[in-house]
Amino acid sequence: MNKNIKFTVLVIGLLLLLLLVYSNHFNNGFYFDDSHTISNNESIRDLSNVWSFFTDASTFSSLPANQAYRPMVTLMNAFDYWAAGGLDPFYFHISIFFWYIVQLTLMFFFFKNILNLSFDNHPFVPVICLFLVGFYGLHTANAETINYIISRSDSFSTLCVIAAFVLFQQTVPRKYYLYLFPMVVGIWTKQTGVMFVPLLFLYVLLFEEDFSWKAKATKVWLSKVITAAKTTLPALIVGFTLFVVNQFIFTPSSTVSSNTTVTKWDYFMTQWYIITHYLSNFLLPMNLSADPDFTVITDFFDPRILIGLFVVVVMFLLALYSFRSRKLRGFGFGLLWFFVALLPSSSFVPLYQIANDHRTFFPYVGLVLAIGFVVCFVAIRNEKFIHKNQLIKPSLLLSAALILGLYSFGTYQRNEIWSSSETLWYDVTQKSPNNGRGHMNYGLTKMAKGEYNLALVCFNKASETIPRYSYLHINMGILNNAMGRPDDAEKSFILAQNYDKNNPEVYYHYANWLLGENRFDEAKKNVDQALVLSPAHSSAKSLLVQILSKGANTITALEIDALEIPSADKYISLSLAYYKNGMFIEAIEACNKALEINPKLPVAYNNICSSLNQLKKWGKAEAACQKAIELYPDYQLAKNNLLWAQTELIKAK
C-alpha cells in the first residue's frame, strides 16, 4: 500500500471517528443564551430580515443588554430556523458541525504550510498535521463550544481566522487581498475575529521575515518589524475600522459590554489564575462546566494569582526563547496565539462571566500548533532511530490512537451531559457549586417535573449567592404560583422588576401570571412594556395575542349578559371592558345605554368623558365631565379628566 493510500485511509478513519464521537449531540437542545438569541428572537423567523441583520444589532437578541453586533450569527440562526421550519436544534447542530469539519480541513493546510516553512517539507509533516487536527477536533473541551448553539460565534469566527491565514499563505489570494474577506466575516461573527491582525503580524515576522534573537544588530530587528508591520497594514486598517464601526456605531447603547462592578486591574489579575484553569482543561479536561463559578480575586498575594502569574511569565519566556531557533519558532508562535486569542476576554475589559470554557476554542488552536512544532522537532531529530527500530512506528501509532481515544471518550461523555437540561445543570451544580445560576436552572428542571419542594431547595440555594438576580425571582414567582401561593408569586414578580427594570423578561413573566389571574388590563400593560424594551420578543407577542383574545372573550360574555338582563351596572362594566381594549366608541354607546336606565349616573358621564378624551374630542369631553361633577361634586376622577380636556382645549386655541 503506497503512502497516499495510507494517508487517505487515515483521513477517512479520522472523519468517521469524529462523526461517531459527535453522533450523540445532534439533538441536544437550546440552553442559556440560546433563549434570547434563538428561541425568543422573532427576527430570525423570517429570512427577509437579512438586511436588518447587518444594520440593526437588536435583531441579534430579544434582550436589550445582550444586543451585540454579530450579523453573521443572526444570519446563520435565521437560515437554520428556515431550513428546520421552526425551532429544531438538529438543523442548527448539523450546520455548526459542517462548518467545524470545514475548519478542521483548513487547519490541516494551515498547520502544514507553517510546519513546512520550518522543516523544509519533511515527509513527517502531513502525518503530524493530521494528528494535530484530530487532536483538536476530538478534544473534549471543544465539545463545550460545539454543543452550545449560540457559541457558533466562537467556532465560526475561528474558522474565518484560519481561512484568512490559508488565503494569505497562497500567492494569488494574497496579491488581491482576498484574505481580508474571511477576516471581515469573522469580525461580523464575533469581535474576536479582529485578533487576526496581531496574529498575522507575528506570523509574518517569525516565518517570512525570519525574526531571531540571534541577529546581533538592532537595525536588523527593527527592519524586520517594520516590514512585518507594512505587510500587516491592510488587515490593520480594515480590521480596526470595522471593529470601531461595529462597536461604536452599530452596537446599541442598551448593550452591556463590560462589568463596571469590578476594577479592571482585579479582573486582569484574576485572569492569570483563569489561564491556569484553561491550561489544565487543555491537558486534562476534567473540570469543564457550562457555567463556571469563578469570582474576582482582589488580593495580589493570593496563591492562585501568584501561581497564575508564574505560569504566564514562564510561557512568555518560553515563547521568546523559542525565537532563537527556526525549527522551534512555531512553538513560540503557538503560545503567543493562545494569549492573543484570549485578549478580548482576559485583559483589562471586565466581563460579567469571569471565565467560560467555550472561550478557549480559538486559543486552543495555538496550543495545538505549539505541540505540533515540538512533536515535529523531536521526530525529525530522531528520524534515523524511528526508521531503524521496527517497534517505534507501531508504538507511536498506538500512542496517538490512545490519546485520540481518551479525548474522544471525554467528548462523547460531555455530549451526553449536554443532552438534557437536567443533566447539564446537575453537572454545573457539581463542578461549580458556588454558581447560583446553576442551582436555579437545575431547580427549573425539578419544577418542570412537578418536584416543587426540590425546586424550592434549589432556588433557596441559589439565593445565597445571587439574591438580586431577576431571573431567580421570576422563577420563584412561577414556583410559588404552581404551589398555590399567588400572593408570594406576585411579590416575587414585582421584586424581579425592581431589580432589573430594563429586562423585558420581568414584564413578560409578570404579564403571563396576571393573565392567569384574569387581570387583563395589568397584563396588557406589562406585556406592552416588554415589547417596548424588546420589539422582537416572540413570546411576548404571542402573549399579547392571548391577552387580547381573552379580553375579547370577556367583552362577549358581558355583552350577552347585558342583553339578557339589562341593568345600568352591567352596561358600566361593559363600557370599562370596551375602554380597556381601546374600543372607545363602543364604550360611549354602552354608557349611553346605562344612562337610558339611570339618567343620573355620574360614572357613566365620567366614562364618556374618558373615552372622548381618548378620541381627542375635547369639547364634548368637557361637557360630559362637567355633567358628572354636577351629579357628584367630589368625583376626583371626573375632575382629573375634566382638567385633561380643558388643558387640551387651551393648547388648541
Q: What residues fall within each predicted segment?
A:
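TPR-repeat structural position
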Residues: W418, Y452, P486, F520, ...
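Terminal, low-structured helical/coil segments at or just beyond the last alpha-helical repeat
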Residues: K541-D569, Q626, E630-K653
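Polytopic membrane enzymes that build or remodel cell-surface glycoconjugates and lipids
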Residues: M1-G484, D488, I494, N498-Y499, ...
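Conserved alpha-helical positions within TPR/SEL1-like repeat arrays
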Residues: R437-M447, Y471-N481, E505-W513, S539-Q546, ...
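Structural marker of alpha-solenoid helical repeat scaffolds
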Residues: K431, T465, Y499, L533, ...
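Single-residue signature of alpha-solenoid repeat helices
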Residues: A455, A489, A523, T554-A557, ...
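Hydrophobic/aromatic packing residues within the alpha-helices of TPR/SEL1-like helical repeat arrays
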Residues: W425, F459, F493, V527, ...
